[in-house]
């Protein structure tokens, strides 16, 4: 790989996964089918290992990845430019990450605000009462987005 925008930006930002770095970056540029030669795990097995997921979509007609995340009881952050985010915003009694999904407003002109909102959500999740979600089963309210969208086959 001679040129990769993600790797170039990580290098520019000094994110080199040093021992002193509190944030570690995992960048796996492949399809997680269990036979990728890097992680050798399926996508859903990877999702299950997360405490929180972030999908800051710029545009997705629906956005299955945040839905899949909450279906596996992993709280998620998404935007209102994904159909899933718009749908979550339409629900009554949905109050952000407490209910499993934080939807951040995103437009062509608010990149910095989106980045700050994601940072603030992750910080609040990791140091606040939400941090307990990592150690305890996800709240099982039938009104949460994950449980509203369940279907039986």
Predicted regions and their residues:
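A structural signal for well-ordered alpha-helical segments within the folded catalytic domains
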Residues: 41, 48, 112-120, 147-151
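A charged, aromatic-enriched C-terminal amphipathic alpha-helix characteristic of glycosyltransferases
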Residues: 109, 129-153
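Short, well-ordered loop/turn elements at secondary-structure boundaries
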Residues: 21, 47-52, 70-75, 97-98, ...
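Catalytic binding pocket for nucleotide-activated donors in carbohydrate/polymer assembly enzymes
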Residues: 56-134
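Acidic donor-binding loop of glycosyltransferase active sites
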Residues: 44-61
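Nucleotide-activated donor-binding/catalytic signature segment of Leloir-type glycosyltransferases, i.e.
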Residues: 1-45, 100-103
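Generic secondary-structure transition motif, activating predominantly at the C-termini of alpha-helices
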Residues: 11-17, 92, 122, 126, ...
């Amino acid at each position: 790989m001679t040129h990769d925008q993600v790797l170039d930006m990580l290098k520019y930002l000094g994110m080199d996964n040093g021992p002193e770095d509190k944030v570690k970056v995992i960048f796996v540029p492949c399809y997680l089918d269990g036979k990728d030669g890097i992680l050798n795990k399926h996508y859903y097995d990877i999702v299950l290992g997360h405490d929180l997921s972030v999908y800051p979509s710029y545009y997705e007609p629906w956005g299955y990845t945040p839905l899949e995340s909450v279906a596996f009881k992993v709280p998620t952050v998404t935007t209102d430019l994904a159909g899933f985010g718009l749908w979550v915003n339409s629900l009554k009694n949905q109050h952000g990450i407490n209910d499993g999904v934080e939807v951040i407003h995103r437009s062509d002109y608010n990149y910095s605000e989106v980045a700050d909102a994601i940072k603030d959500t992750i910080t609040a999740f990791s140091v606040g009462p939400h941090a307990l979600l990592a150690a305890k089963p996800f709240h099982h309210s039938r009104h949460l987005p994950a449980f509203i969208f369940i279907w039986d086959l």
